[in-house]
């Protein structure tokens, strides 16, 4: 028998993280969730540094992308990214504790537009923008 029980918005990111070994490797933790918004955090580790001894640009991008994906899916439908971009504002260092908060700016039947702020404390270090396509598939328990 198929499970037709829908997951509540705040449970969807938890399920997504449990199925996401890459985000687990990054050490991402979910801090806050509500429909259309998700805040996550992680700490930059030595193995995340590039040849200049700064965090690889993909680290901030990956944190932002995870927050974006989690927030986009809180509407209960599988949502997949179709376009993303990031502005790296400040270099990141080993030991930096980063947060990324994704807020949906506009959502339609099929598309959702998000802004993600990546911060080190109160300092904005990256700004990510993303568009998702919302499928008809429901998140279920």
Predicted segments, located by residue:
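Terminal targeting signals and extreme-terminal segments of soluble enzymes
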Residues: 1-141
């Amino acid at each position: 028998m198929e499970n037709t029980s829908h997951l509540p918005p705040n449970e969807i990111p938890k399920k997504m993280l449990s199925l996401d070994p890459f985000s687990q490797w990054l050490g991402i933790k979910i801090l806050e969730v509500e429909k259309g918004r998700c805040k996550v955090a992680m700490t930059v580790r030595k193995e995340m540094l590039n040849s200049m001894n700064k965090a690889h640009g993909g680290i901030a991008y990956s944190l932002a992308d995870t927050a974006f994906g989690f927030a986009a899916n809180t509407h209960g439908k599988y949502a997949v990214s179709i376009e993303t971009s990031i502005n790296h504002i400040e270099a990141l260092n080993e030991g930096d504790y980063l947060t990324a908060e994704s807020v949906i700016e506009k959502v339609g039947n099929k598309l959702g537009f998000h802004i993600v702020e990546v911060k080190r404390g109160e300092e904005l270090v990256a700004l990510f923008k993303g568009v998702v396509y919302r499928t008809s598939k429901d998140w279920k328990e």
